[in-house]
């Protein structure tokens, strides 16, 4: 492989910026740029050491940056290649000049995610662990971070490998029974034994799939839409949850003319919180566009926060909103409890049909804790805190597990219908192959390229 280089820290002003190199020529290329005290070179440095010095243009001798350089030699590195990390002062100009020097001296600009891709290709991590790196970077809550860390440390991989080993052992027994039925010292693979083996694998796959809903919520966040008539307090609710002003809050109906989105962490539940323009008919063309977008977002939501005005009677528009969210996960919020109550609370509970109803005065910052508790109780059962739980959150993994379960079901149905054992073997082999796709065994190169292209440069 050639040697790659990239800036591994976010662009912009900061205390430190890092230029990373990986590959067989990493140390040699860095040495061409490095000027150490008393003529010290990086080539003579031991692995996993850090060295003070300067980066200089090898053609002009001009000093570009004062640096600390880490030397990490293969195979005890993230990529299992020689790795150099040049710690520069944070900024844009100097760190870019250091990168350009590395490219001029023989390195190639890394593609997005190429460092992690090399870690995968060199056997340092498997595909599910590589995907967990991105999950860790994108984690919005402590629980999401813990999920990613467990996967990155190989908990899911270990379970998948164990299931594959069990399937492979079963397949080997089937093969021996087919090819050498006369051998007395080989355990006979009866239909009953085959059912036991296949059912055991199915049970574990189903257990993983039961964790997928909460896992996906932690990974991607709940698409949460705030709806209500104009001026009932939707934008105030958004700002209360986000703890900063994101939307215009006035007494004028219709001041939110578009969809406003923000990530918030509500007691460990990540919400992609969306404030919508009031869903009503309007003559204002700009506001009408916002209303149309609101309706589309509503259809795609995981959770609805339906806001009502506690100081006004229920209107026909309010009732229509209840009808629009029929069958969806909804929390009803009666806002403006600081004003005289005019709403029919019993009628609201009737329309809510058993779904949570909370009261708030967002102006006085009252009732937010009750709302957060309602959100937590809807989507968090406590299972995520279990340190022993292994589960899936990645959409690709979930899809593969569903296919693997179907393959096991097909095998069990075949056994029940007394089909030839070699036909059952095909379905079990299919399940074994599918599970291998989770950890990166026998996956197409285009899929690998597509997965790593989602990473940032330098990772």
Swiss-Prot record:
**What's the cofactor?**
K(+)
Cross-referenced PANTHER family, in alphabetical order?
TRNA MODIFICATION GTPASE GTPBP3, TRNA MODIFICATION GTPASE GTPBP3, MITOCHONDRIAL
- Physiological role: Exhibits a very high intrinsic GTPase hydrolysis rate. Involved in the addition of a carboxymethylaminomethyl (cmnm) group at the wobble position (U34) of certain tRNAs, forming tRNA-cmnm(5)s(2)U34.
* Co-factor: note: Binds 1 potassium ion per subunit.
Query: Where does the record place it?
Result: Cytoplasm
Sorted alphabetically, the Gene Ontology BP terms of this entry are: tRNA methylation; tRNA wobble uridine modification
Q: What is this protein called?
A: tRNA modification GTPase MnmE
Keywords on record: Cytoplasm, GTP-binding, Hydrolase, Magnesium, Metal-binding, Nucleotide-binding, Potassium, tRNA processing
Q: Name one GO molecular function term.
A: GTPase activity
**Which family does the entry's similarity section mention?**
Belongs to the TRAFAC class TrmE-Era-EngA-EngB-Septin-like GTPase superfamily. TrmE GTPase family.
Q: Which PROSITE patterns match?
A: G_TRME
Binding site residues for K(+) = 231, 250, 252, 255
Originating species: Bacillus velezensis (strain DSM 23117 / BGSC 10A6 / LMG 26770 / FZB42)
Q: What is its main location?
A: cytoplasm
Report residues binding GTP.
231-236, 250-256, 275-278
TrmE-type G domain spans which residues? 221-380
Q: Identify the EC number(s).
A: 3.6.-.-
Listed under subunit, the entry gives: Homodimer. Heterotetramer of two MnmE and two MnmG subunits.
One term under GO cellular component: cytosol
Q: Which residues bind (6S)-5-formyl-5,6,7,8-tetrahydrofolate?
A: 20, 85, 124, 459
Q: What class of enzyme is it?
A: hydrolase
Annotated Mg(2+) binding lies at: 235, 256
**Matching Pfam families:** MMR_HSR1, MnmE_helical, TrmE_N
């Amino acid at each position: 492989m050639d040697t790659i280089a990239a800036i591994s820290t976010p662009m912009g002003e900061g205390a430190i910026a890092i230029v990373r190199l990986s590959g067989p020529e990493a140390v040699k290329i860095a040495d061409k740029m490095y000027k150490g005290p008393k003529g010290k070179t990086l080539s003579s440095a031991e692995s996993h050491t850090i060295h003070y010095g300067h980066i200089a243009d090898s053609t002009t001798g001009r000093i570009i940056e004062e640096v600390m350089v880490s030397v990490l030699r293969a195979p005890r590195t993230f990529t299992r290649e020689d790795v150099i990390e040049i710690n520069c002062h944070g900024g844009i100009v100097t760190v870019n000049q250091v990168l350009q020097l590395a490219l001029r001296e023989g390195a190639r600009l890394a593609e997005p995610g190429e460092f992690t891709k090399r870690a995968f290709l060199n056997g340092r991590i498997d595909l599910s662990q590589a995907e967990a790196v991105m999950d860790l970077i994108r984690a919005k809550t402590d629980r999401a971070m813990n999920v990613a860390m467990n996967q990155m440390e190989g908990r899911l991989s270990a379970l998948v490998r164990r299931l594959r080993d069990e399937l492979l052992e079963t397949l080997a027994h089937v093969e021996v029974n087919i090819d050498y039925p006369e051998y007395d010292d080989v355990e006979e693979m009866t239909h009953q034994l085959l059912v036991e083996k296949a059912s055991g694998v199915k049970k574990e796959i189903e257990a993983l799939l039961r964790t997928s809903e909460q896992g996906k919520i932690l990974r991607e966040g709940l698409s949460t839409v705030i709806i209500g008539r104009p001026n009932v307090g939707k934008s105030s609710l958004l700002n209360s949850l986000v703890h900063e002003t994101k939307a215009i809050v006035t007494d004028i109906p219709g001041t939110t003319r578009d969809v406003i989105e923000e990530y918030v962490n509500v007691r460990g539940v990540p919400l992609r919180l969306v404030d919508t323009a009031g869903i009503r008919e309007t003559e204002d063309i700009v506001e009408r566009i916002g209303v149309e977008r609101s309706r589309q977002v509503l259809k795609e939501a995981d959770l609805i926060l339906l806001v009502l005005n506690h100081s006004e009677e229920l209107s026909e528009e309010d009732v229509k909103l209840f009808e629009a969210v029929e069958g969806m996960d909804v929390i009803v919020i009666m806002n403006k409890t600081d004003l005289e109550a005019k709403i029919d609370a019993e009628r609201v509970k009737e329309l809510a049909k058993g779904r949570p109803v909370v009261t708030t005065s967002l102006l006085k910052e009252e009732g937010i804790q009750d709302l957060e508790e309602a959100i937590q109780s809807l989507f968090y059962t406590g299972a995520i805190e279990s340190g022993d739980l292994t589960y899936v959150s990645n959409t690709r993994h979930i899809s593969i597990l569903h296919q693997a379960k179907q393959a096991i079901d097909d095998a069990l149905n075949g056994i029940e219908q007394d089909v030839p054992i070699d036909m059952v073997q095909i379905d079990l082999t299919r399940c074994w192959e599918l599970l291998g796709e989770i950890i990166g065994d026998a996956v197409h190169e285009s899929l690998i390229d597509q997965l790593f292209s989602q990473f940032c440069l330098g990772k």
